[in-house]
Amino acid sequence: MDIMHGDLRRNGSNQSVPSRHGWIDMEALSPLADQSMPGEWSVGLCDCFGDLHTCCLTLWCPCVTFGRTAEIVDRGSTCCMSGTLYYLLSTIGWQWLYGCAKRSSMRSQYSLRESPCMDCCVHFWCGPCALCQEYTELQKRGFHMAKGISSPPHLPTV
């Protein structure tokens, strides 16, 4: 998709980019806009309630949220295997170690900051919030989480 050439410009309060067919409003291209800002998470750690579906899924079935995220981060590991391992580790209170490893992998892939603190601390103290943040980040990057890695990120067409 070759829509951008030239510099990003401010057009009033909206960010716009030039294309072959005129200026494109970046707010209309949110998945693309999110990818163009390396280092920043698209949602905060405590924004769990922004997506009620993800919040409820994570609250009642964290192994499903984790498995779906891990499948995409690992680019093909099965959702069931990762989710089951997460569940088994949660029975002894060690799921945060596995969550920490996946969060680190995800941050490396997408050049995200280790914020608000170290990955292990985030998963130890705020595990459900971390799972929601990671799941939502991948959604905003265009992944259809229920389909997993078989659905590559989709970008809006212009």
Swiss-Prot record:
GO cellular component, one term: membrane
Signal peptide: none
InterPro entries (alphabetical): PLAC_motif_containing (IPR006461)
Localization, UniProt: Membrane
TM region(s), chain numbering: 49-67, 78-94
Family annotation (Pfam families): PLAC8 (PF04749)
Keyword field: Membrane, Transmembrane, Transmembrane helix
Topology in the lipid bilayer: Multi-pass membrane protein
PANTHER family, per the entry: DUF614 FAMILY PROTEIN-RELATED
Family assignment from sequence similarity: Belongs to the cornifelin family.
NCBIfam families: A_thal_Cys_rich
Protein name as annotated: Cell number regulator 11
